[in-house]
From Swiss-Prot:
Protein task: Subunits I and II form the functional core of the enzyme complex. Electrons originating in cytochrome c are transferred via heme a and Cu(A) to the binuclear center formed by heme a3 and Cu(B).
GO molecular function: copper ion binding; cytochrome-c oxidase activity
Class of this enzyme: translocase
Binding site for Cu cation: H235, C270, C274, H278
Encoding gene, per UniProt annotation: ctaC
Cofactor requirements of the protein: Cu cation; heme
Cofactor binding note from Swiss-Prot or TrEMBL: Binds a copper A center.
Catalytic activity, reaction form: 4 Fe(II)-[cytochrome c] + O2 + 8 H(+)(in) = 4 Fe(III)-[cytochrome c] + 2 H2O + 4 H(+)(out)
Keywords carried by this UniProt record: Cell membrane, Copper, Electron transport, Heme, Iron, Membrane, Metal-binding, Respiratory chain, Translocase, Transmembrane, Transmembrane helix, Transport
InterPro entries: CcO_II, CcO_II-like_C, CcO_II_C, Copper_CuA, Cupredoxin, Cyt_c_oxidase_su2, Cyt_c_oxidase_su2_TM_dom, Cyt_c_oxidase_su2_TM_sf
SUPFAM superfamilies noted in UniProt: Cupredoxins, Cytochrome c oxidase subunit II-like, transmembrane region
Pfam family name, one: COX2_TM
Official protein name in the record: Probable cytochrome c oxidase subunit 2
EC id: 7.1.1.9
Amino acid sequence: MKNIIRHFSKPAYREEFKEDTSPRTAEYKSVSEDSSTGLTYTLPPKAKFGKMSIALICFLIVSCNCFASEPLPWQVTFQPPASPIMEELHHFHNFLLYISTAIVLFVAGLLGFVCIRFNAKNNPVPAKFSHNVLIEIIWTVIPIIILVIIAVPSFKILRHAEKIPKTDLTIKVVGYQWYWHYIYPDHDNLEFDSVMISDENLKPNHKRLLDVDNRIVIPENATVRFLITAGDVIHSFAVPSLGFKIDAVPGRINETWTRVAKKGVYYGQCSELCGIHHGFMPIAIEVVSKEDFDNWIASKNKTAMNGKKPKLVAN
């Protein structure tokens, strides 16, 4: 690192390499010229490695945005879990990753060993046998054990997600082409449409293709049940950070639940191909304090469909 600092700050350092004719200069691979001084200098391997390290650090600093708490371009991992179900799914995913990695390494190593150990050069006369009882038992029993180990926590999470606990709030969700309609039956059937905000109406704090004109608002630390259906074709109500993806099927009501402890806005999208503007059906759930939620309910005007569809951004 000291060499790198000297390289960028002291021309004398470059002169040193220019004048040095000792055998150690044979190690230097890179030659360049300083336009400000006219000096030609060679760059030592350590300095080259240092410049690569700086570039790598800069890349990591920029790419760490991919691990932020909201969906971003080029994101390579999950959003941080915001609900009990998603926390369990996150841990289960990591658990499966260890098992999958071990299996891949074992199979790849075994394949490489067999290719080298039993090729035609090393074994000009191949062995002749049709089966091996011990090996067949092993490759049957071990996968069964692995599947059982995977199944136990998987069924536990599935049961936790399917069993609706005592809820503090119920919200009805109806999917239409191409917007969402929400109803709060616990609050005098308060209802409203939720349509994606167009590009020309976006504000600095809005997320393009994700923010809507009317968000779902729920209180923090409240158990919320969603009753989900559709009014035309099949849609899917999905919010990754909350760990649910529930199909909205016409003529059928599906349900799920969530509980969010952290205030903020959590985004999702329709995750079932539902027509030409399927990609313009975002979901935005805003989590606020209980006091703010009560104030929002009090100030929110009731809306009615009146047999009319809202004006869609995508139209």
